[in-house]
Amino acid sequence: MAEPSAGRQKVVIVGAGPVGSLAALYAAARGDDVEMYELRGDLRDPNTIPLNFTKSINLALSERGITAMRQANREELIDRVLADAIPMHGRMIHGRSDGKLWEAAQTYDVHGRAINAVDRGTLNNALLDELSRTPNVKMFFNHKLTGADFRTNRAWLERRTPGTASTPESVTEIEITFDYLIGADGAHSASRYHMMKFARVDYQQEYIDALWCEFRIPPSPETGDFQISPNHLHIWPGKEFMFIALPSADKSFTCTLFAPAWHYEKLEKSSPQDLVTSFDYNFPGVCPNLITPEALAEQFTENPHLPLISLKCKPHHFGSSVVIVGDAAHAVLPFYGQGLNAGLEDIPVLFSFMDQYGVYDDSISPTPEARASARAAALQAYTNQRTADTWAINDLSKQNYLEMRWGVKSPVYKLRKMVEETLDHYVPSLGWQTQYSRVSFSNQRYSEVIASVKRQGKLLGVAGLSSVLVSVMIGAGVLMRWPERLSLGAVWRTVFGRN
């Protein structure tokens, strides 16, 4: 990391979630004066309502996110976050056959690495507490970005009084200036909206044909412990539906039902008993075993049924004055557990380009004009690299939805996973890894993950074809040597060892 520069910059960050907070730590460590503005109240207050109006407390934290936080050089931060994390070593697939419930574990990684289920409140609190102890950071809550001029580096915000209706009397408009602004304000980003007035942004937004609703599996009423294994991501797969459960620190599980909109409409018109029947048919063992019928109906009725959005855009910046990160630049579907991790990873990538181009080196950027020029080059380089990677994880997340719904039960999926893990474990010099391991347990660029997996797929295809050809050649040789003694059935049994 570069040493703090003598020429301090003023950095404004919009959004005080994990990505914006981490960006504030990185900028502050380089000597910048940081102001962070958040639409909501202080996220450390349990009464602050999340923007999606749910109280979901689970996040999946893997290698990329952990690395990004470690590189902030705040050891207490990562220790605090991981202290209460629950490691998930694999998936637990649930089903029913011949009237009997079954579950089957699938490890994530042949080397035993795990994804961490972390508490959203713990993560937010840890980051914001670090910022509170940082003298060159100021935090402003209940501030809404309403306008920005990225040519003159000015922005306008409404300061709102908590707990009051938005009226001219309760809202005060303020104007701020900055050297550059980081927009980390989510999928419906105001920063991106205002940046698009200045930059020619290619923008693609997509809602998939699925809604999600949150449920909760409580701790065991008898023991107070987890009702099912806490060290797995639990999946009840179906071709069109999926129910998943992630462990929480209070021994409960936060669950999500993913289903097409038409299925939600059907259930909304159904009776509570029909809801229970639907769950019993599609997700055997959930109700009444883990969630009571009354709780299931109550949670389905009271919790919102929300859409799933993904977006891509390019560029992620304009000039030297603004850059968008996290969901503001690349909201992804939740099916790879990489939304948080990709957003956190944006920050070290961004600041590595800032360092590389001398933004914080006074010998390279001795004046504000020189720093602005270096910053523009750094932001352009960031866009050039990060766009390819964020588009890649966007595509991978969509593909993983299909895998989680029914691919996890596919013999082809299981065979390829077994072959790749065997090569990874016994012949590590080949550098062979499953796609999941590359995404979740490495810092390899997402775009390079796709390229590597394609190469592995081609090699497996060639190897499989070669095996078939060798078998055919052996069979042909046997027929030519003893044509009168062997039938085709005998050859089949000889070559393939089958009856």
From Swiss-Prot:
GO terms for cellular component: mitochondrial outer membrane. Its main location: mitochondrion. Pathway: Cofactor biosynthesis; NAD(+) biosynthesis; quinolinate from L-kynurenine: step 1/3. It catalyses: L-kynurenine + NADPH + O2 + H(+) = 3-hydroxy-L-kynurenine + NADP(+) + H2O. GO terms for molecular function: FAD binding; kynurenine 3-monooxygenase activity. It is found in: Mitochondrion outer membrane. Its EC number is 1.14.13.9. Disulfide bonds: none annotated. It comes from the Eukaryota. Its cofactor is FAD. Keywords: FAD, Flavoprotein, Membrane, Mitochondrion, Mitochondrion outer membrane, Monooxygenase, NADP, Oxidoreductase, Pyridine nucleotide biosynthesis. GO terms for biological process: 'de novo' NAD biosynthetic process from L-tryptophan; anthranilate metabolic process; kynurenine metabolic process; L-tryptophan catabolic process; quinolinate biosynthetic process. Catalyzes the hydroxylation of L-kynurenine (L-Kyn) to form 3-hydroxy-L-kynurenine (L-3OHKyn). Required for synthesis of quinolinic acid. PANTHER family: KYNURENINE 3-MONOOXYGENASE. Belongs to the aromatic-ring hydroxylase family. KMO subfamily. This is Kynurenine 3-monooxygenase 3. It comes from Aspergillus niger (strain ATCC MYA-4892 / CBS 513.88 / FGSC A1513).
